[in-house]
Amino acid sequence: MVSKDEKPKQSGLFSVESLLETPKQKCREDLPKPTPITPKTPMLIPGLHPMTPYFGAQLDPVMIYFAQTGNRLPIVSSDSSPESCASSPLSMQHSLQWLSSQREDSPTSDDAKIQIGLSKCMLRKHKNNRKPRTPFSTQQLISLERKFQSKQYLSIAERAEFSASLQLTETQVKIWFQNRRAKSKRLQEAEVEKVKFAQASAYAAAAVGGAPDPSSILAFYQPQW
């Protein structure tokens, strides 16, 4: 026999509160607890460089999933600013892309513009300041060439007298003689190269056979300078 005092206790087991609370507790106990994923080694995320601030940091499980599966990360809309993108780990790739595009699309800095302007001004100034060539007359050129053939270097007194006879300044005569000596040197070097080339060709032909003596060929070649 069950005493009257024990009936309320038994009836309490089947009350509405006990029936509602028991499934909740069982469901909570049966649910598997998620194990925290903490990679021991730094995880490489596609699109991120190892030297970025996010490398080696605590990563979100969703980020690890996309990194392991090779799927592309969701990209945030381009309307978002870099401050809002940086707050979410999933938008790191978009942030880097946004920064790189901003860096590429950014106009030339003021310093670079100033340097370009200065270089252009210097080139333009140098070009405008170049003195025009002295328009020598035909008679003056003939006299200068004759004087150069007789003497390539003039003394100060000779240059003063010669420039006065041609109605030219001493500087003009001096510069003309300098340029003429440089031209004569170039012509001599070109003639030497021609002689070397002819000699090499003659020896090559003699080595093949059937060609005359190279010395007989070079005897007809008279360098002119």
Curated annotation (Swiss-Prot):
Q: Which GO terms describe its cellular component?
A: nucleus
The record's annotation in InterPro entries points to:
HD, HD_metazoa, Homeobox_CS, Homeodomain-like_sf, Msh_Homeobox_Regulators
Tissues in which the protein is found: Expressed in the ectodermal cells of embryos and seam cells and ventral cord motor neurons of young larvae.
User: What does the UniProt entry report for the null mutant?
Assistant: Worms exhibit the absence of AVM, PVM, and PLM touch cells, defective egg laying, embryonic or larval lethality, cell degeneration, malformation of the posterior body, and uncoordinated movement.
Q: List where this protein forms a coiled coil.
A: none
User: Which GO MF terms does the UniProt record name?
Assistant: DNA-binding transcription factor activity; DNA-binding transcription factor activity, RNA polymerase II-specific; RNA polymerase II transcription regulatory region sequence-specific DNA binding; sequence-specific DNA binding
Q: Which CDD domains match?
A: homeodomain
DNA-binding region residues: the ranges are 129-188
For this UniProt record, the keywords arranged alphabetically read as follows: Developmental protein, DNA-binding, Homeobox, Nucleus, Transcription, Transcription regulation
List, in alphabetical order, the GO biological process terms annotated in this UniProt record.
embryonic morphogenesis; locomotory behavior; parturition; regulation of transcription by RNA polymerase II
SUPFAM superfamilies (alphabetical) = Homeodomain-like (SSF46689)
Predominant cellular place of this UniProt entry's protein: nucleus
Instruction: Tell me the domain of life.
Output: Eukaryota
Q: Where in the cell is it found?
A: Nucleus
Biased composition annotated in UniProt, kind: Basic and acidic residues: 23-32
Q: Give the residue ranges for region: Disordered.
A: 1-44
Role this protein plays: Probable transcription factor needed for the proper production of touch cell precursors. Involved in specification of lateral neuroblasts. Essential for embryonic morphogenesis.
Q: Which family does it belong to?
A: Belongs to the Msh homeobox family.
UniProt xrefs under PANTHER family: HOMEOBOX PROTEIN MSX, MUSCLE SEGMENTATION HOMEOBOX
Protein name, entry field? Homeobox protein vab-15
Native organism is Caenorhabditis elegans
